[in-house]
């Protein structure tokens, strides 16, 4: 029987076609599921929320000043007691919150409200406990707190009209430096 003539390039061509059938879908899956790059945090307009809050607030509001352009304001919210809060639930008290991302991308948050101090402090400090030591910043006395897992540190200031909590996953030195930038903005009459 005569041997059939074979094209010597057929085996190579078939191998390349088989590889393409396998590699192309894998590359498409990798491309589809890979992240498109780092997203920059969305800046929020703290001044707009602060303006509204100072008209409605029954207590002086704290806001950071002079942080520098590397700090990004990423949260600003105000709600009167009973109005929708950022959680979608009614605010339990007159509530002010502002948060910034540091140049190291650590979130530094300030929460301030009147009423229900114990539950508020427990929530804002991630169920933290006092660790001793007081700090003076923004014309207030602040007590140091640390969360149960030791990750989050907080400064708590209980005033006559309100309670304020500054919290971050940072050491107390950085937290106190942030608290030193806070200034009180009086409510408008």
Where are these regions (language model features)?
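Generic surface-pattern signal
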Residues: 33, 55-59, 126, 180, ...
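Charge-rich, low-complexity N-terminal segments
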Residues: 1-79
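Short, solvent-exposed recognition patches
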Residues: 46-148
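A short, solvent-exposed beta-edge/loop patch
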Residues: 131-189
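Generic hydrophobic secondary-structure signal
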Residues: 15-32, 67, 89, 98-100, ...
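Residue-identity detector for threonine
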Residues: 10, 54, 87, 125, ...
